[in-house]
């Protein structure tokens, strides 16, 4: 909007911001952490779909076992890793601290623990593959050990970041609760 003083009205150059109210930092932290957790949950869901598809295709004999290998033992408990994400999603709308704590603990049990067990389960096979070049399980022509280790590296990062942002969100909610109690 043009004014008589020039192209910009006086007082709209951003110099008058100091007196304005600002959003409290714990609200900013809460909003940004919720956003990151939602993005990570989408990535986790995509990883979960890949694992569930491999388990389903293998058990329903939709394709030959030469094309898609039988699942490793760690993949079955990992299918429960969707539960912590669901509980975390329930915690978000009303800032429910107890649901978020349950989500964080169950993420360790149902998401991270199966991945650690899987790394230990597949280590001898990975060692054999890299020492002797022999693989006995394949997923679409690729070594199943290599494919699953790649998936596990991505999954462990996703779950670690989910737990990290959940902790930041929990801290923001506790700060908000403490400030309300002080008033």
UniProtKB/Swiss-Prot annotation:
Which parts of the sequence lie on the Lumenal side of the lipid bilayer? 61-66, 121-137
Recorded GO cellular component terms are: endoplasmic reticulum; endoplasmic reticulum membrane
Q: Which Pfam families match?
A: Jagunal (PF07086)
Its membrane topology, per UniProt?
A: Multi-pass membrane protein
- InterPro entries, sorted: Jagunal
Its domain of life reads: Eukaryota
Give the UniProt subcellular location, in the record's own words: Endoplasmic reticulum membrane
User: Which keywords describe this protein according to UniProt?
Assistant: Endoplasmic reticulum, Immunity, Membrane, Protein transport, Transmembrane, Transmembrane helix, Transport
GO BP term, pick one: protein transport
Indicate the transmembrane segments per the record.
40-60, 67-87, 100-120, 138-158
Q: Which residues lie on this side of the membrane: Cytoplasmic?
A: 1-39, 88-99, 159-183
What this protein is reported to do is described as: Endoplasmic reticulum transmembrane protein involved in vesicle-mediated transport, which is required for neutrophil function.
Q: Which PANTHER family match?
A: PROTEIN JAGUNAL HOMOLOG 1, PROTEIN JAGUNAL HOMOLOG 1-A
Protein family according to the UniProt entry: Belongs to the jagunal family.
Any idea what this protein is called?
Answer: Protein jagunal homolog 1-A
UniProt organism field: Danio rerio (Zebrafish)
Taxonomic lineage from the root = Eukaryota, Metazoa, Chordata, Craniata, Vertebrata
């Amino acid at each position: 909007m043009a004014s008589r003083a020039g192209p910009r009205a006086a007082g709209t150059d951003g110099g008058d911001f100091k007196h304005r109210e600002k959003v409290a930092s714990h609200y900013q932290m809460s909003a940004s952490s919720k956003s990151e957790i939602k993005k990570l949950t989408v990535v986790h869901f995509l990883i979960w779909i890949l694992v569930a598809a491999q388990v389903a295709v293998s058990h329903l004999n939709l394709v030959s076992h030469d094309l898609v290998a039988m699942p490793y033992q760690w993949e079955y408990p990992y299918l429960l890793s969707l539960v912590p994400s669901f509980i975390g999603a329930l915690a978000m709308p009303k800032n429910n601290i107890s649901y978020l704590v349950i989500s964080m603990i169950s993420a360790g049990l149902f998401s991270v623990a199966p991945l650690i067990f899987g790394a230990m389960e597949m280590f001898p096979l990975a060692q054999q593959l890299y020492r002797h070049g022999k693989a006995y399980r394949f997923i679409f022509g690729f070594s199943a050990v290599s494919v699953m280790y790649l998936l596990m590296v991505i999954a462990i990062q996703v779950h670690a970041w989910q737990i990290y942002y959940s902790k930041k969100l929990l801290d923001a909610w506790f700060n908000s609760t403490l400030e309300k109690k002080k008033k």
